[in-house]
């Protein structure tokens, strides 16, 4: 994860801003510079290589002192930065919006995947600039639309029916922020279209998950798609989701947390996120991840796609 200010800076033109990508050498210069505390939040002028990110974001980059950041010297950083700028320059960003836009934290791996989709001549994003920009605006939180299959970050497709597409995420092969744990395996499920889904197609997906992925939990980060993760990583996902939800609420970024279909989501995760939305503490919510839930005999009998979040969330409280 990284702020958009780690990739580009704004230049005022008339009544709106044009965004310009950083280059590797400007970032490297900023990382070696000694900057006063009062200037940590200002864009850094490298003199030789142009503008660089504010020094307060140094930890977002991989250095000798910090191996968890982005590999900023790889060409992929420039590709991601250019893609972000193209998307932001396709809309109007005013002076009242620019600070909020640049402070937004985005998924670096998601954006690298969009670059890979853009470069794949067999992919629809290679052929459609409009769809590509739409995908980026969704990825950086500048669009309220959900990530559907056409605008998804991509990966290796392992299952598809009329309503859903399931992707195996390819973060191990990334250049900018690769997953270093070789045992990492995670999937994402996107809806092919943002519209009501028939029980038949939901049942097909659930059958696939139960037979092929019974060692994984189906969860959501509230953004309109499903994640299929190892049970051992669920607690880590819970910490991240809770922190993001609270930070958004604190900063005034009111984003609706989409609980998705209760029949697909792992019961304990549905209980966790439902309780989180009701304002319970992290400790109370996380207890629900480790409680035994009563399984409904037939989740399809008499059920619609309507959410019933309040019923589950108070179990064990």
From Swiss-Prot:
Binding site for ATP: 107-109, 188, 221-223, 227
Keyword match Metal-binding: yes
Active site residues per record: 225
Domain of life the protein comes from: Viruses
Entry's Gene Ontology molecular function annotations: ATP binding; metal ion binding; nucleoside diphosphate kinase activity; ribonucleoside triphosphate phosphatase activity; RNA binding
Matches recorded under Pfam families: Rota_NS35_C (PF02509), Rota_NS35_N (PF21067)
Chief place where the protein resides: host cell
Keyword Magnesium found: yes
Top EC class, one word: hydrolase
Cellular-component GO terms for this entry: host cell cytoplasm
GO biological process: one example: viral genome replication
Cofactor(s) demanded: Mg(2+)
The enzyme's E.C. designation: 3.6.4.-
Region named RNA-binding: 205-241
Compartment(s) where it occurs, according to its Swiss-Prot or TrEMBL record: Host cytoplasm
Quaternary structure and partners: Homooctamer. Interacts with VP1; this interaction is weak. Interacts with NSP5; this interaction leads to up-regulation of NSP5 phosphorylation and formation of viral factories. Interacts with host DCP1A, DCP1B, DDX6, EDC4 and EIF2S1/eIF2-alpha; these interactions are probably part of the sequestration of some host SGs and PBs proteins in viral factories.
Family per record: Belongs to the rotavirus NSP2 family.
Protein's UniProt name: Non-structural protein 2
Species: Rotavirus A (strain RVA/Human/Japan/KU/1995/G1P1A[8])
Lineage start: Viruses, Riboviria, Orthornavirae, Duplornaviricota, Resentoviricetes
